[in-house]
Amino acid sequence: MSDASDASDAVSAPSTVFSRVAASAAWKRLNRLMPALAAAVILLMGFVLIAVTPAGHIPDVWAHTYRIGGIVNGDVLARPVDSTSILHSGSGNVGGCVSRGWIQFSIDHYDGYDPAAVNADFLERYGMGSTTAGSGTNSTSTANTNACVDTPYNNAAVNSPVAYLPQLAAFAIGAASTLTSGTTYVLAEVIMLLVYAGCMFAAVAALPRWRLPMALLLVSPPLIFRYSFAISADSMAQALCLLFACLLFSCMADPRAGNGRLAALMTVGVLMGMSKFTFTPLLLLGFLALIPCHSAARHPLPRLTAPRIAIVAAGNIIGFAFLAAWMKLTGWFTTTPSIVSYEAMTAKKSQLFADPFGAHGLFGAIASIARAIITGQSNLDSRMQTLVILSLWAVLAVLLIVLIVATAKRVFSARMGWFWWYACAVATGIILLTYLALWLQYTPADATGVDGVQFRYFLPLSGIFMLCACECVAGLRRRASHASHTSHTSHTTPRDSSTASESTAVPSVADAARA
């Protein structure tokens, strides 16, 4: 009976091994296809969303549309304008000269969703007469007043043209081909979607591991909805930030990552910072990629050489120099002067350190931000936004606990351990900086907490948190498995040891078959 059982085991063992080999080959094939699959799903969902999302039904879309129109007409930097809109209804408005066709298009498609749109009588009030463009006393423009009208867009004026490169290409094609505003609007969304999908393809392809979890994150509806195609600075910023996270992990986790990959990382990082200046601190993480990776791999590992230092240093210098210059060029106005005037914002800023214990001092700001986080305060007190924001902060809290446990159990090398702590700290700091910016520029002096918070501010940084979670959980599972195996081995009897040694011979059959 025992001999028959042994014979049955001997027959079944090779078939089990071969099935495992086939499964491993299928998984490797799927892993290779993962970038293309993720990009295909994003394109499919993106085109469906473009078809079903009405024009103008995206946050701040009209402000971004006006901003792009102003850049096309020569107003690369915003300037004071006398005109008003639904959101910017008072003084202190800045903007540029926007083509009449785009203004009329926004009026025709205004559905009450985005208050950045101009009023219905805008062209009658500001588009008549023969004055030159830039009717404000301090404004100048290269555009012709017969073709465009000064339009306010404070909340988009802080964005650099880099954030709108895909849409600028669409607007240029539309102008050259004399397309209607409606056709150009859709063209801009399509080009943005293609760029976004390309970035996500490159992001997944750059990963040495965790392609499936990252692909699932990238195709999740919250990330694709709106900001995979929207006419918005946030679309480009989100695409570049997610790509940067994957390239950064690739440079840290792959011992063979060379100068080319490091240069790609810093190039994407500089463009990311130019698209949204609050992401610029992420460039500092590039210095961690300079730490040599000690490995027993047969391939020679990149060392700390002058070219590698120069690549990272140049990226940081360019990124932070652009940040300083752009903030100086755009620091003379506020994003919503009808809610918080420039004078009120400057007073708040000056009191941060002048009166740190006051209501508008440093500790007052910290208390307001803490209150907003604990209560999940959201823009317009949206219950859905509040629940999502609270959930996201809860996820970050759980990730912190997991990271602490993983560090305590030493599942990382010292190099990767420092990296994950710094990466999560910088990413969380960027979210907190966004809270501070909203407290300064969007929250009235008599308000409690922080107004204007939206869960979309978390999404571009989700790639860093996802990869950290994968590394922590995998490391803890390996450590638990190793501990369990060690415990089992220490209690094995001589008979069990003999059986175990026989069973360990089975994989050699698979190796022979694979060879």
Regions found by a protein language model. Name each.
Residues 1-47, 307-316, 419, 481-484, ...:
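Start-transfer (signal-anchor) and selected internal transmembrane alpha helices
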Residues 179-182, 201-222:
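Transmembrane-helix signature of polytopic, membrane-embedded enzymes
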Residues 230-237:
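Short acidic/glycine- and proline-prone juxtamembrane loop motifs at membrane-interface regions
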Residues 247-253, 281-317:
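Perimembrane helix-loop-helix junctions
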Residues 261-288:
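Membrane-interface alpha helices of multi-pass inner-membrane proteins
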Residues 297-307, 402-429:
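Membrane-interface helix-loop-helix junctions at transmembrane boundaries of multi-pass membrane enzymes
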Residues 324-409:
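Membrane-lumen/periplasm interface segments of multi-pass, membrane-embedded glycan/lipid transferases
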